[in-house]
Design a protein with these regions (language model features):
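Short, charged/polar low-complexity linear motifs in solvent-exposed/disordered segments
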Residues: 14, 26, 70-72, 228-229
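Short aromatic-enriched loop/helix-cap "lid" or pocket-rim segments at secondary-structure transitions
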Residues: 20-23, 41, 56-58, 64-65, ...
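Feature activates predominantly on carbohydrate-active enzymes
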Residues: 57-91
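Generic detection of intrinsically disordered/low-complexity segments and helix-coil linkers/edges
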Residues: 23-25, 38, 42, 46, ...
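Ligand-binding pocket scaffold of soluble enzyme catalytic domains
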Residues: 49
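Segments that shape or occlude catalytic/ligand-binding pockets
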Residues: 3-7, 12-43
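Active-site loop segments of alpha/beta catalytic cores
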Residues: 1-16, 45, 54, 79-234
Length: 234
């Protein structure tokens, strides 16, 4: 093929992670039209009530370790309270961040804690990976992921309405530096249907959809394609 004259890079994108979504405070990753968070302001509860601890040395947060909220995915409805994005103060956030839309760059929503990362936050890592392959828990995980997809879609719609975004990046790490955390078959069965629902909704709204997914995940590329992801960002 021919050489392109120009290839988009992250410098061509302006992103927003507003404080109105408390996950961005909990994760220490709130970036909007105001000074960044101080270390002592980071951490605390996310929108599901899970407690995060900010680790200043690495500039990020982790769930408070050693006491996972959910030991069996079948119990998620008794343990987890789903947030209602309609209750967030979007109007005030929209007024604050209106100037960001005029940056001249593609404007994206960046959504932390995708489906698998959210499951990890509830169950810790070992519990989450086991739940993906445990026949006694998989139906419950499907049900939970379906509800999480609904919440993501509602939050995306709020970003469209109040910020006028052009695209969406969802963070969901699926691998380590050596290999994915799970097989392609598991990704196709447990994650792809819900990522595809989110991606398809973005496309219906005229947005591009990028999945940020750290790891040596080349063997999962067919899953990203089947999920209708436009860009895999590692």
């Amino acid at each position: 093929g021919e050489k392109p004259l120009w290839i988009p890079t992250t410098d061509d994108i302006m992103f927003i992670t507003p404080r109105v979504i408390v996950d961005n405070i909990a994760r220490g990753f709130a970036f909007e039209n105001m000074p960044p968070l101080k270390p002592e302001e980071c951490g605390g509860p996310d929108m599901f009530g899970t407690q995060w601890v900010f680790v200043e040395q690495v500039g990020g947060s982790m769930v408070r370790p050693g006491n996972p909220r959910l030991l069996d995915a079948n119990d998620w409805k008794e343990v987890i309270t789903l947030p209602d994005p309609d209750t967030f103060d979007w109007e005030s956030s929209a007024k604050l961040n209106a100037p960001l839309k005029d940056s001249g760059r593609s404007f994206q929503a960046m959504l932390l804690n995708g489906l698998f990362e959210r499951l990890i936050s509830f169950m810790d890592f070992e519990g989450a990976v086991m739940a993906l392959i445990d026949d006694d828990q998989k139906d419950a995980v499907h049900d939970l992921f379906s509800h999480l997809a609904d919440i993501h879609i509602k939050i995306i719609d709020k970003h469209i309405e109040y910020y006028g975004i052009d695209g969406v990046t969802m963070h969901d790490d699926w691998g380590s530096q050596r290999a994915p955390f799970f097989s392609l078959a598991t990704a196709e069965e447990m994650l792809v249907p819900y990522v595809r629902r989110i991606a398809d909704h973005c496309h219906e709204k005229g947005l591009w959809f990028q999945q940020h997914s750290c790891g040596k995940n080349e063997m999962l590329v067919p899953a990203y394609i089947d999920a209708h992801v436009d860009i895999w960002n590692g």
